[in-house]
């Protein structure tokens, strides 16, 4: 059995975070038909990939910490279904916090 290439998985993580860090209007344009719901999948990517990449030595402790902050923030978002609409994506301040956390994680990844 061949394990997935950690560098390819890191690229996937970066691409996901780049999208998560974009302004709401860009997210809505890029993710037509339920952008908020699609961003939920990005959270799942981060939650699964970050520990794997840390274990593989591909990301450092600071990047892992920032990815953890993004993950914890999204865990709190999951508690409120009202936040998972495109309208909320534009208006709810918790999404702006999400974008900031994604940008910080990208920065820690050297992006």
Predicted regions and their residues:
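Short terminal alpha-helical segments
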Residues: 1-50
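Generic structural signal of hydrophobic/aromatic residues within well-ordered alpha-helices
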Residues: 13, 42, 70-73, 105
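Secondary-structure edge/capping motif, primarily at the C-terminal ends of alpha-helices
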Residues: 20, 24-28, 53, 77-84, ...
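Solvent-exposed, non-transmembrane amphipathic alpha-helical segments
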Residues: 26, 30-33, 87-90, 94, ...
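Intrinsically disordered, low-complexity regions
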Residues: 34-35, 58, 69, 111
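Amphipathic protein-protein interaction modules
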Residues: 48-101
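Short, charged, intrinsically disordered terminal tails
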Residues: 100-111
